[in-house]
Amino acid sequence: MSEAALTRSQVAAMVDHTLLKPEATAADVTALIDEARSLGVLAVCVSPSMLPIRADGLVTAAVVGFPSGKHHSLVKGAEARLAVDQGATEIDMVIDVGAAVAGDYSAVLADILTVREAMGESAILKVILETAALSDEAIVECCRAAVRAGANFVKTSTGFHPAGGATVEAVELMARTVGPGVGVKASGGIRTTQAALDMIAAGATRLGLSGTRAVLDGLTD
């Protein structure tokens, strides 16, 4: 699908409307859910502590090991299992970025496998790589580990790392590496319509956005 062919509703159907600020309140998350419904997006992505707030009619994603990825793998697994039990249908987990930087891809694989096994097969697993902090080689190897572990998506960024967020180059590399059977979620710093379209053109099949309205307002149906 070309950029010119994309309508507002088509892009909205790729969006995880996201609120992960540590100061977010229950009222903020309720407002996020209401806005997500009004915008017609696919999903909301929230902190697991906010899962008791119902988001009927929307896919609900929760983050795990967020944002550092330095939690013990068993803690990540328990967090993912609890999130699924509380209604999350998708899990966005952060890898141990330090292990990736060190080239310890066996540890990266084991970390992802622990979460995948703990959460079960009923929910979608997205694996956050923090690509701005990684070399191209590390991005490729972490993508391969995610595929081997049974992930459904690889994801660029938490949006909280000082190295930055999603780039077209990282998305292209991830899409080439995982192939058509695994999705690519671009997130972190996508604030304009053109930036979103550029990510889609590069191979992103899902977008993590906090400023969703501003992005969608640049499109028509």
From Swiss-Prot:
Pfam families, alphabetized: DeoC
Subcellular location field: Cytoplasm
Keyword match Secreted: no
GO BP term, example: carbohydrate catabolic process
Keywords, in A-Z order: Cytoplasm, Lyase, Schiff base
Taxonomy, superkingdom: Bacteria
Temperature impact on function: Optimum temperature is 65 degrees Celsius. However, half-life of the protein at those temperatures is low (approximately 2 minutes).
Activity regulation details: Inhibited by tetrahydrofurane, acetonitrile and isopropanol.
Record's function text: Catalyzes a reversible aldol reaction between acetaldehyde and D-glyceraldehyde 3-phosphate to generate 2-deoxy-D-ribose 5-phosphate.
Quaternary structure note: Homodimer.
This protein's name: Deoxyribose-phosphate aldolase
Organism of origin: Rhodococcus erythropolis (strain PR4 / NBRC 100887)
